[in-house]
A protein has these predicted regions:
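Catalytic phosphate/metal-binding cores of nucleic-acid and nucleotide-processing enzymes, i.e., regions
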Residues: 1-143
């Protein structure tokens, strides 16, 4: 016997699938941006075995982005958020709680369809990652 679903329930299921697809696409985009910038192959972390990797270490599959080369380790724990309503506190908590030892938790986010991408990380992690040469420079005086 087939159970009938209400139109509202079907609509919620469809909305959930669209949201999941939207999130997956954003994760792929962020993996490509980071990979292109740092010359390393990154992929969206598989949620259900969609991406096979030789390394079976659980830490490799935390966060939304993983490195393909099992001889390397991604030192950032990246959570990607592509949502209309920002919940920064919860996102940061998720990134920090899920982050493996020795890695830096970051949240990459933007408001769906309406803003630039941003990165959020603790001040302590920021000062560790960004070298002095990118913060302080020599002033050039015109003659």
């Amino acid at each position: 016997m087939k159970l009938k679903t209400t139109p509202k329930k079907e609509e919620n299921v469809a909305r959930g699938k669209r949201a999941k697809r939207k999130g997956n696409n954003y994760e792929r985009l962020i993996a490509k941006i980071f990979g292109d910038k740092y010359k390393v192959e990154l992929k969206r972390t598989p949620q259900s075995g969609g991406f096979a990797k030789k390394s079976e270490k659980a830490d490799d599959f935390r966060g939304d982005i993983t490195i393909v080369d099992n001889k390397q380790v991604l030192l950032l724990h990246i959570e990607c958020k592509n949502q209309k309503n920002w919940q920064l506190k919860q996102w940061i908590e998720q990134a920090e709680e899920d982050c493996p030892e020795g890695r830096t938790p970051i949240v990459v986010f933007h408001k769906h369809n309406s803003s630039k991408d941003y990165v959020c990380l603790s001040l302590e992690d920021f000062t560790e990652l960004v070298p002095k040469s990118k913060v302080v420079g020599k002033r050039v005086f015109k003659k």
